[in-house]
Amino acid sequence: MTDRDTLFSAPIASLGDWTFDERVAEVFPDMIQRSVPGYSNIISMIGMLAERFVQPGTQVYDLGCSLGAATLSVRRNVHHQGCKIIAVDNSPAMVERCRRHLDAYKAPTPVDVIEGDIRTIEIKNASMVVLNFTLQFLEPDNRQLLLDKIYQGLNPGGALVLSEKFSFEDASVGELLFNMHHDFKRANGYSELEISQKRSMLENVMLTDSVEAHKARLHKAGFEHSELWFQCFNFGSLVALKGGQA
């Protein structure tokens, strides 16, 4: 049982920028389930993708791992010898709780949980990399550099899973899906005040891209194939493949 997210239920006099601090980490499972449509589906399908792409003796990277939901999904579905998962997050509160969550679910595949900057983590011998709602929090100038590094660190036949909140080039579509997302949050018990205050805190730190912009970056990084495999309203996930045989 996780704590319910009531962080923004009362007026906040001075809304700063969003941070993944202790208070957010404490309610994060409830927050993300009630805020991100399709999140549970994406997490479970990441495990299925891992079963298909992860190879013996290779590494899996979960970059921006938060509390380790994607890492747990991968670990449940990887049964090869010599594999290791490297989970990275720059939030001390998230890392601490992630380690506790992983310790509670024993499995043969080892996991290294690292408190650090995903932009400086070395990526090597990777059969799969996960960026699950992470890239949107990087400065735009750093996004291509990270994707370039991921491509270089992936083995031939490896896969990148990139989940994001999207913007849309068609303003009418963007408005519709934006409103549907807000209906989703209201249906999950968030008030107008909670929705408004959280949006104000996120607007300077979460900068979204269109699916087309993501695909262009992935192509520039060297990925031979990329496609949207899941979408619910303005949230979704792409898979990008490095050519060659695993």
From Swiss-Prot:
Q: Which GO terms describe its biological process?
A: tRNA wobble uridine modification
What's the domain of life for this entry? Bacteria
Q: Which reaction does it catalyse?
A: prephenate + S-adenosyl-L-methionine = carboxy-S-adenosyl-L-methionine + 3-phenylpyruvate + H2O
CDD domains given in the database record? AdoMet_MTases (cd02440)
Q: Which InterPro entries match?
A: CmoA, Methyltransf_25, SAM-dependent_MTases_sf
Q: Does the keyword tRNA processing apply?
A: no
Instruction: Report the GO molecular function annotations.
Output: carboxyl- or carbamoyltransferase activity; S-adenosyl-L-methionine binding
According to its UniProt record, the EC number is 2.1.3.-
Q: Quick one: which residues bind S-adenosyl-L-methionine?
A: Y39, G64, C65, S66, D89, N90, D117, I118, N132, R199
Top enzyme class, one word, equals: transferase
Instruction: List the keywords (alphabetical).
Output: S-adenosyl-L-methionine, Transferase
Q: Share what the entry says about its subunit structure, partners included.
A: Homodimer.
Per the record, the similarity remark reads: Belongs to the class I-like SAM-binding methyltransferase superfamily. Cx-SAM synthase family.
Role of this protein: Catalyzes the conversion of S-adenosyl-L-methionine (SAM) to carboxy-S-adenosyl-L-methionine (Cx-SAM).
Q: What is this protein called?
A: Carboxy-S-adenosyl-L-methionine synthase
- Species this chain originates from: Enterobacter sp. (strain 638)
Q: Which gene carries the instructions for this protein?
A: cmoA
